[in-house]
Amino acid sequence: MTLKTIRGKALMGAALCATMLTFSGQAFADAELKIFVSSQHQPDIWRKALDQYEAKTPGVKVVIETGGNTSEMQAQYLNTVMSAKDSSLDVLMLDVIRPAQFATAGWTSDFSGKDLSAYLPTYAEANTVNGKIVALPAFADSMFLYYRKDLLDKYGIKPPTTWDELKEASKKVMEGEKNPELQGLSFQGKAIEGAVCTFLLPYWSEGKSLVENGKLNFDNKAAVDSLKLWKSFVDDGISKKNISEVATDDTRKEFQAGKVLFAVNWSYAWTHFQGKESQVNDKVGVARLPAVKGGEQTTCLGGWEFGVSAYSKQQDEAKKLVEYLSSQDVSKFMAINAALLPTYAALYKDADVTKTIPWFADALPVVETAKARPVTPRYNEVSETIRTTVNGVLAGVMTPEDGAKQMESRLRRVLR
């Protein structure tokens, strides 16, 4: 993995000043903190928030370290650092599925006495392990359906509410456009964390759960249906033949280049779609993900958290920094400047936020009802089982029926 250190002194607006009055307090003496930030989630914008923190907290310098374009790559790196009890990292940005793992391993410090009631309940729950607060929310997230608003309008099509409707819409537009580079749908088929959500979306839509009370609750029919659905997009020519090689940011890049009609992706993609180099600027709509026929529309809960390394030699300074980064003012700043969904309900009605990103006004119900992936200390094994199976089916290595059978067998060994 290639790692890089980002330093900068870009100035922020006044949006964070009120927060800094709270967090300036007594200065720490010559403390340099290192924070690991997901390279996919706007480290340049986080840098601006950190610059303001430095400006108001004399004696504290913060260095950003990034690495890895997927949740798995980042987790692999952090697992190596934490297993070695390395003190070089003070603050860790963790995928919402990781706090339980890291806390169980003894890799994060607790935030004793912290009140999480101001945050969205889902994230308060995700960061509480065995009654202890082990991390604080960085930003919320859910999967959404991005679509080419201009093309749907051109062909008189409404945003689809079922996957069957999406197929029909894709066929109509693709036939009409006669553009061999235009895909109907892009989603995550590579053996990454996104493929876990790929599998669960139709599975959940049938009203099924995967784990209950820590025990496997596998529904074979729903699993086969899910795998068949995704494979059918490839077989019907709606999705590219090598979808098994497509990761989250590949979907984002292809949609941004104007080569995709519908895309399943997270909120971070919005800012990229509206950028100067985007081919779809002002042509993008956002909707809830479709349902299977007769099922419910549902989505996969995402989001990232900030934890303090148990091996940091600057515990107080690191916790102060995390309190700041998890504050409502920083959450608002990141929503406006990076299109990262807030972890505070009030910000979804904030005039400054909705003026900049209007669709955020309708995003709260989606985030609040999003379903979480299984929470278990053995999540890595659960994830690896699901994503490799999805990838194998999409690559044509196994049938949906064989994939579901193999998935159940492997999961039963993990979740006994």
Curated annotation (Swiss-Prot):
InterPro entries: Bact_solute-bd_prot1 (IPR050490), SBP (IPR006059). Pfam families: SBP_bac_1. Keywords: Periplasm, Signal, Sugar transport, Transport. Binding of ligand results in a large conformational change in the protein, and complete enclosure of the ligand. This is Sulfoquinovosyl glycerol-binding protein SmoF. 6-sulfo-D-quinovose binds at residues 41, 303-304, 373. 3-(6-sulfo-alpha-D-quinovosyl)glycerol binds at residues 40, 71, 95, 141, 194, 248, 303-304, 373. It is found in: Periplasm.
